[in-house]
Amino acid sequence: MDCETRGRGRRGRGNRNEESRDVRLSKSLSYVLRHGASKMGLQMNSDGFVFVEELLAHQQFRSFSVDDVERVVASNDKQRFKLCKHPEDDRLQIRANQGHSVQVTDLELREISQDDQDYPREAVHGSYMKHWPSIRSQGLSRMNRTHIHLAPGLPGEGRVISGMRQSCDLAVYIDVTKAMSDGIKFFWSENGVLLTPGDAAGILAPCYFSRAQRLKPLPCDIELH
């Protein structure tokens, strides 16, 4: 089986207990594969993959099966995970597509060039109005992660599937072309999230903000300065 991202489609009708288990498994997978593998004694390869058999042998995952993992990966509408067989020994392995706080040197990211015809000239970062004063004055920070997450549009627009939470009530729009002209790098993740490490300090400065919107209760433009 070739490596492929399994995450299209929605979970069919199931009982609430199964749904709750799936949510719990999805959250646990996100933590382990993005942040906590080494803390839990699990070996993560340089490309971010962890072997499923080793994962399921861990105390936190012993109540789950390979079928559970496959179902959660397939039903994840944001395609957060990639599940495939290792090319050398066919052992099943899993990784998170983005969102890491641990350094993953061989993560499959595609760097964007201004020569690309399809790169988004403007991208959006989702946050919350309570953070707007600090964002407006200091910029966006990758904080403890390796990248700042952006989307090519708001959730539900076109083929936008990931990049910001549905609960966000603030949208900060980034002038991608201007930032790239100043040497800021941008990458596509496998599930369509636009990623940037920001500048040397991990910041995307306010000078790259093109506009901002309060999203709830109704979209409304807000002042940048």
UniProtKB/Swiss-Prot annotation:
One of its GO terms (molecular function) is tRNA 2'-phosphotransferase activity. SUPFAM superfamilies: ADP-ribosylation. InterPro entries: Ptrans_KptA/Tpt1, RNA_2'-PTrans_C, RNA_2'-PTrans_N. The keyword Ribosomal protein does not apply. Pfam families: PTS_2-RNA. Residues 1-21 are annotated as: Disordered. It catalyses: 2'-phospho-[ligated tRNA] + NAD(+) = mature tRNA + ADP-alpha-D-ribose 1'',2''-cyclic phosphate + nicotinamide. Its EC number is 2.7.1.160. It comes from the Eukaryota. GO terms for biological process: tRNA splicing, via endonucleolytic cleavage and ligation. Keywords: NAD, Transferase, tRNA processing. Belongs to the KptA/TPT1 family. Catalyzes the last step of tRNA splicing, the transfer of the splice junction 2'-phosphate from ligated tRNA to NAD to produce ADP-ribose 1''-2'' cyclic phosphate. This is tRNA 2'-phosphotransferase 1. The lineage of its organism: Eukaryota, Metazoa, Chordata, Craniata, Vertebrata. The gene is trpt1.
